[in-house]
Amino acid sequence: MSTDLLEPSAPITTITTVTTVHTHLRPIDRDGLMAFADKGRNNPASRGTNKVHTVMEGQYRSLSYVGNHAPVVVDEPLHLFGQDTAPAPGEIVLSGLGGCLAVGITAVATWKQVKLSKIEVFMEGDIGNPAAWGAGGALQKTPPEMGFQAIRVKVLVEGDAPREVLDEIVQHANFYSPVANSMRNPIPFEISLAD
């Protein structure tokens, strides 16, 4: 075995060119958005109806059907006696909130003609179920003591506007979010057996 060191014949040079590519999220139709806004302004009492059909598979796993979409699967984690095959109901609620906030941020940014390159919504919710769904737990608890007790949302948003403008867009979208307002405000709720 030779102990001679090999000398390189020429120095190795690496040239790296960095190119920053800025892409924007797929836009929505601004003209359509403005027409929708006009419709709401001209008829502020207008309402739509969302319909969902939920079918229990067994244990706590259920399938919720919405239009022609694939079913939304809901389950509970193992420590709550589910199979942990899908998000829990509270996580689905937070998912709906995140989706609604992201839609609102997109709409407000489009209205203000700000191009966004990223929206990520991070949510946490402190939820209580001491009554064990009413199945013999802390039955003295009242509705305000059950369910979500606090929700925290952080939004990562990037676009072609200063941070202050992006924050204004997020706050505006939150203020007018149908799902956020459903969670913040008491709403009439009724339940009965189907015919």
Language model region names:
Residues S2-S95, I105-D195:
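Extended beta-strand/beta-hairpin segments
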